[in-house]
Swiss-Prot record:
This protein binds specifically to 23S rRNA; its binding is stimulated by other ribosomal proteins, e.g. L4, L17, and L20. It is important during the early stages of 50S assembly. It makes multiple contacts with different domains of the 23S rRNA in the assembled 50S subunit and ribosome. GO terms for biological process: translation. It comes from Xanthomonas euvesicatoria pv. vesicatoria (strain 85-10) (Xanthomonas campestris pv. vesicatoria). This is Large ribosomal subunit protein uL22. CDD domains: Ribosomal_L22. It holds the Pfam family Ribosomal_L22.
Length: 111
């Protein structure tokens, strides 16, 4: 029995979010939330909300025991980029890409 939660177009670079996602992949759900709670990275707060949502989905929709859940898969995919313009010297301009991420968390029973 698995439950899934998805956060789409989170305003964080996928490269930065994957650093945090790699830390919690495979951990028990309770341990993952505790680890994310005390991390000072922006991605940790976003991923913590998605993990808690997946845990709530498993508990409410499928009646799973929260103590037996673990983070089975966590994926951080690239979302649409916001294109911005920054003025530079001598009338030039450069393009800035504000990257977004799609964060997917699947929790399931630890066997």
């Amino acid at each position: 029995m698995e439950a899934k939660a998805i956060l789409r177009t989170a305003r964080i670079s996928p490269q930065k979010a994957r650093l945090v996602a790699d830390q919690v992949r495979g951990l028990s759900a309770e341990r993952a939330v505790n680890l994310l709670k005390f991390s000072d990275k922006k991605a940790a707060h976003l991923i913590k909300k998605v993990v808690e949502s997946a845990i709530a989905n498993a508990e409410n929709n499928q009646g799973a025991d929260v103590d037996e859940l673990k983070v089975k898969t966590i994926m951080v995919d690239e979302g649409p980029s916001l294109k911005r313009f920054m003025a530079r010297a001598k009338g030039r301009g450069t393009r800035i890409l504000k990257r977004t991420s799609h964060i997917t968390v699947v929790v399931g029973a630890a066997k």
